Curated annotation (Swiss-Prot):
Record protein name field: Frequenin-1
One GO BP: regulation of neurotransmitter secretion
UniProt subunit comment: In contrast to Frq2, does not interact with ric8a.
Binding site for Ca(2+) 3: D156, N158, D160, K162, E167
Underlying gene: Frq1
Gene disruption: observed consequences: Increased number of type Is boutons in neuromuscular junctions of abdominal segment 3 muscle fibers and reduced nerve-evoked excitatory junction potential.
Other comments on record: Binds 3 calcium ions via the second, third and fourth EF-hands.
Outcome (variant: K94R): Gain of interaction with ric8a which is as effective as interaction of Frq2 with ric8a
Outcome (variant: S138T): Gain of interaction with ric8a which is as effective as interaction of Frq2 with ric8a
Binding residue positions for Ca(2+) 2: D109, D111, D113, Y115, E120
Organism for this UniProt entry: Drosophila melanogaster
Length: 187
């Protein structure tokens, strides 16, 4: 991606209109806003956390924002270029349920081994609880560990202590509240 330019090239726009759910006009608008917030064309992890803090002032979104940042940063170079940003935004804001669940699975599967372990699930659920601050939950979900236990009871069909993409997808579709919780962090 080399040197960052403030002008969006037509081939980049064409690629993004093909690869995302955004129109050329929307892409140009998002690019303008992106450059306003990130004049050098790169969004750092600290900048990303700062954005989340604006939306979740009552909690601490730092941990969750860092985890989401990792999924946005497709090439793992420590910053988010506009193309990475718009592709992730397309899925999280306009994608269909399967695309959103695939994206969420990548978020939860921190080590990218194709499974979500209890520890990985706990990591995300704990980050979400920190982000939203204290909100009343039912007795069986009032701690991150209880929430993880409940999710695994529902989703881990073969009881091997880890979730495959298929188990995650089916379990999420069977429980609309899980999908609602996912959209909390998905954008």
């Amino acid at each position: 991606m080399g040197k960052k330019s403030s002008k969006l090239k037509q081939d980049t726009i064409d690629r993004l209109t093909t690869d995302t759910y955004f129109t050329e006009k929307e892409i140009r608008q998002w690019h303008k806003g992106f450059l306003k917030d990130c004049p050098n064309g790169l969004l750092t992890e600290q900048g990303f956390i700062k954005i989340y803090k604006q939306f979740f002032p009552q909690g601490d979104p730092s941990k969750f924002a860092s985890l989401v940042f990792r999924v946005f940063d497709e090439n793992n170079d420590g910053s988010i270029e506009f193309e990475e940003f718009i592709r992730a935004l397309s899925v999280t804001s306009k994608g269909n349920l399967d695309e959103k669940l695939q994206w969420a699975f990548r978020l939860y599967d921190v080590d990218n081994d194709g499974y979500i372990t209890r520890e990985e699930m706990y990591n995300i659920v704990d980050a979400i609880y920190q982000m939203v601050g204290q909100q009343p939950q039912s007795e069986d979900e009032n701690t991150p560990q209880k929430r993880v236990d409940k999710i695994f009871d529902q989703m881990d069909k073969n009881h091997d202590g880890k979730l495959t993409l298929e188990e995650f997808r089916e379990g999420s579709k069977a429980d609309p509240r899980i999908v609602q919780a996912l959209s909390l962090g998905g954008g």
